[in-house]
């Protein structure tokens, strides 16, 4: 693919903060810096990458940028080893027998701890082959990686199996966060997910937080962390490093 050879893909980073406004992590998002169209979001090209077998190359680009960023933040004494960056893993990647090897090839190159990489999988992926999913997750967790369930509440996984999956985190989808202020149902769904996460000893992150009213309410609801435009828009690694440094110094 010409765009890969031309280095047009890169990771953008969106910070996650806790209820004390401390930066606790970030999510890495693939972007295509198209020479004519400008910055293109992942939803426009990921299906094509999946179809033509380029998805692993894109993941490696993102992981490469994550490692560079983590090392820069460490070198400037901005983070410690508890800081982690999330990366989205597709169904085909998760099912690949090469996933663990691909991950270690890159993090070993940069001397990054596996525990600083959080693998985000969607809720729907949990229900495809439960036994295989648990085995694959346990193998990667044994190697040090962390797991997060992205867009929780939008899929069809059985809650009875949720405790069997060795995940660290649930992420509440933006579609629910949008409704917490003006919908009793929206509020109750978000509160239920938070309570469920707490009962299973999982961290819960709210995605798509855009207003101070949402932030304040989620804080009262005992959320663990938040991300969204209110905190910061996604930034390239240089922009993120500056943002993180400024916000760490301000704390």
Describe each model-derived feature in a short phrase.
Residues 106-109, 135-143:
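Catalytic-core regions built around general acid/base machinery
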Residues 1-48, 88, 149, 227, ...:
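Active-site core of bacterial EAL-family cyclic-dinucleotide phosphodiesterase domains
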